[in-house]
């Protein structure tokens, strides 16, 4: 990027569509759910239910070593089943979305973004959705996008990334 003189790039992900499930009793599902290019009245698409991360080799946030620890991560919890600290998950301890803040604003427990609480390392994340049930032979469609933008400094690139994401969301919708 230095030879292109476009600044520090930013990358982001957006969860466009989750699996299709039946609507709950009394829930307005007049819009219906999307699946494989078809609208399904009386159904809904699940939204992302949690976002968790782990760090390869970190003593606190290390990789899951069995299915129970992996399942905790899929629920937006740490591998031992405890909640993430509020520096990561925000002031609401029921928050299941790590780093949901706006990186263009100051980091705080009201705006958690990936700060300097642990050194740089092999970081991984999970965009989770559920629960839902699938029988053998069932099909589901989950759609997400991965975006890249570069526009000046790091924060300018994040602002541009948000514009790119908004355009992609509009195109998908």
What are these regions (language model features)?
Residues 1-173:
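Extracellular/surface-associated beta-sandwich interaction domains
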């Amino acid at each position: 990027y230095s030879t292109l003189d476009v600044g520090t790039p930013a990358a982001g992900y957006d969860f466009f569509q989750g699996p299709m499930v039946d609507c709950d009793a009394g829930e307005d599902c007049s819009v219906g759910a999307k699946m494989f290019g078809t609208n399904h009245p009386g159904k809904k698409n699940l939204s992302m239910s949690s976002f968790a991360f782990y760090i390869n080799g970190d003593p606190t946030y290390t990789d899951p070593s069995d299915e129970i620890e992996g399942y905790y991560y899929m629920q937006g919890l740490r591998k031992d089943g405890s909640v993430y600290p509020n520096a990561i998950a925000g002031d609401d301890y029921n928050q299941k979305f790590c780093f949901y803040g706006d990186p263009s604003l100051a980091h705080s427990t009201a705006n958690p973004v990936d700060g300097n609480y642990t050194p740089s390392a092999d970081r991984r994340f999970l965009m989770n959705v559920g629960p839902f049930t699938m029988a053998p032979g069932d099909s589901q469609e989950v759609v997400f996008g991965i975006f890249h933008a570069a526009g000046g400094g790091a924060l300018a690139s994040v602002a541009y990334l948000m514009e790119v994401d908004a355009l992609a969301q509009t195109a998908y919708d």
